[in-house]
A protein has these predicted regions:
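Topology signature of small-to-medium multi-pass alpha-helical membrane proteins
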Residues: 1-146
Length: 146
C-alpha cells in the first residue's frame, strides 16, 4: 500500500511577486550587514582580555545577543511588509550612522581592516535605508496595513 504525502514548503522570503525591487535589495543588504557584524564581533572578541570580570561580560554579551535576535526578526518581517519592522530597522540604521559618525570624529578612522569593513557595512545599511524610503517601497508598506 502506497501512501502519498503532500507537503507544501515555502522557503521564499517574499511571498508576493509584487514586492518592489528596492525592498528586496534592502532586505538582502540588511541580512549581509547583520552577518558581517556577527563576524566582526567574533573577530573583535579575540582581542578582549579574558582575565576581566566575567559577570559584566556575560551580561553585555547576553544583551547584545538579544538585540541581534530582535534585529534579525525585524529584517525577516520586512519581507512580509510589516511597517513596524521598517520603522525599527530604519531607527537602528539611524543609530548606526550616528554612532559611526561620532566614532569617526572622536577617534578617527583607523587602518585596521575591521574598522574599514564596519564603515563599509554602515554605508551599505544607509543605502538600504534609503531604498526603504522610496515612493514604491512606502506605497507597498502602506498597502500591507490591514
Amino acid at each position: 500500500m502506497e501512501v502519498l504525502l503532500r507537503a507544501n514548503a515555502d522557503f521564499i522570503f517574499f511571498r508576493e511577486h509584487k514586492t518592489p525591487n528596492s525592498v528586496r535589495a534592502a532586505v538582502a543588504i540588511y541580512w549581509i550587514a547583520l552577518s558581517v557584524f556577527v563576524v566582526r564581533f567574533g573577530l573583535a572578541l579575540r582581542t578582549l582580555p579574558f582575565s576581566a570580570h566575567r559577570a559584566p561580560m556575560i551580561t553585555v554579551f547576553g544583551l547584545l545577543f538579544t538585540v541581534l535576535i530582535f534585529e534579525a526578526f525585524a529584517i525577516a518581517q520586512l519581507s512580509y511588509g510589516k511597517l513596524w519592522a521598517r520603522n525599527v530597522v530604519l531607527f537602528s540604521t539611524a543609530f548606526a550612522i550616528v554612532t559611526t559618525v561620532y566614532s569617526l570624529f572622536a577617534n578617527g578612522l583607523h587602518s585596521e581592516q575591521n574598522d574599514v569593513v564596519g564603515l563599509i557595512s554602515v554605508a551599505a545599511e544607509t543605502v538600504a535605508g534609503l531604498f526603504l524610503l522610496t515612493a514604491k517601497s512606502t506605497a507597498w508598506f502602506k498597502s500591507k496595513i490591514k
